Regions:
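Conserved G/P- and acidic residue-centered "switch" motifs that form tight phosphate/ATP-binding loops
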Residues: 62
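Short Pro-Cys-Gly-centered "Cys-loop" motif that presents a nucleophilic cysteine in a tight turn
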Residues: 1-53, 57-58, 66-311
């Protein structure tokens, strides 16, 4: 039976579920969960999507993701592929790790969004020792919602959902806690099961339109780095590597380009090289002070991106 086409929207909010094949746990150790979240953060820096809630269990994980104009399939396929490669290398195994495609369901109402977050945060209730205290589970965003811990992943935007409870942080946390602790019932679980529904969340949120001309990216990178544009086409040079890495990162983010598209722009490089350059670009904006504000500066210089929530 052919697979149904995934329902997607450039301004969609999604319930994403990942799951491993039956015989293999998705996360064998706690370090695996940490690694997955770190790798998701790397992809977040590339694509600028938002994560509103998450919970990682031993064989599956749940997320609420706002694509913010990016292609959710590109994000999840790339992320899961990278995690599977790393997992197989560490545990000396071959073959598939994830069960089929990731599952996604578009969120259609504010009520559904709120109840979905509570459902996700209640997942640890099935684990011995957490039956009455899901907030103590380390690999869930509930602890951040309730103010018990800071978000150490850098992934989370809990404020988007919490604002529906109160503008006052303390009141919002108290009201959200009450919701989580009263909504662990079978009716809610049935409501939130994945079905073949074509639903869509629409709001006043503005999203990034990712259709920039790649030449505009190259000019911006050259201006900000002070490195001549000719270096985009030179091989085996330190400056060339820097500008190519930053350009690859921004083209993936703001042009919605894949590795093949970027190869055509930069010329005479392999897709695997582009993938490595993108990783270098993420490292540069994460660790080098002179590049840390590069993406925000690009946004501030282009009025159609300004105030669209890219962080």
């Amino acid at each position: 039976m052919p697979r149904t086409k995934r329902q997607k929207s450039e301004d969609g909010i999604y319930h994403i579920m990942i799951k491993s094949i039956t015989e293999v746990p998705l996360f064998k150790k706690h370090e695996d969960k940490i690694r997955y979240l770190k790798q998701m953060r790397e992809y977040q820096k590339i694509y600028g999507f938002k994560v509103y809630a998450y919970c990682l269990m031993s064989n599956h994980g749940h997320f609420i993701i706002d694509s913010n104009g990016a292609d959710i399939s590109k994000i999840m396929h790339g992320l899961n592929f990278k995690y599977a490669i790393t997992f197989n290398r560490i545990y000396k195994r071959n073959g598939h790790l994830f069960q089929d495609r990731f599952k996604s369901k578009m969120v259609d109402t504010q009520r559904y969004l709120i109840m979905l977050s509570a459902y996700i945060h209640n997942n640890p209730l099935d684990i011995r020792g957490y039956e009455k205290c899901p907030e103590k589970y380390k690999y869930s965003s509930l602890k951040v919602y309730l103010g018990l811990e800071r978000d150490n992943t850098g992934l989370l935007d809990e404020g988007f959902i919490m604002q529906f409870f109160s503008n006052n942080v303390k009141e919002a946390r108290e009201r959200y806690a009450k919701l989580v602790y009263i909504c662990d019932d079978e009716k809610m679980k049935r409501e939130l099961e994945f079905k073949d529904e074509k639903t869509e969340y629409r709001s006043e949120r503005k999203v990034i339109i990712r259709n920039f001309d790649p030449q505009e990216i190259l000019k911006f990178i050259s201006k900000e780095t002070g490195i001549n544009e000719i270096m985009f086409y030179i091989r085996n040079n330190k400056n060339s590597k820097i500008v190519k890495a930053l350009a690859s990162l921004l083209m993936r983010s703001f042009c919605n380009y894949n590795c093949k598209d970027i190869c055509k722009v930069l010329g005479n490089i392999a897709q695997s090289t582009v993938s490595r350059l993108c990783s270098i670009g993420v490292e540069l904006i994460s660790t080098e002070d002179k590049y840390k504000n590069l993406i925000n500066k690009f946004i501030s210089e282009h009025s159609n991106l300004k105030a669209m929530g890219y962080t």
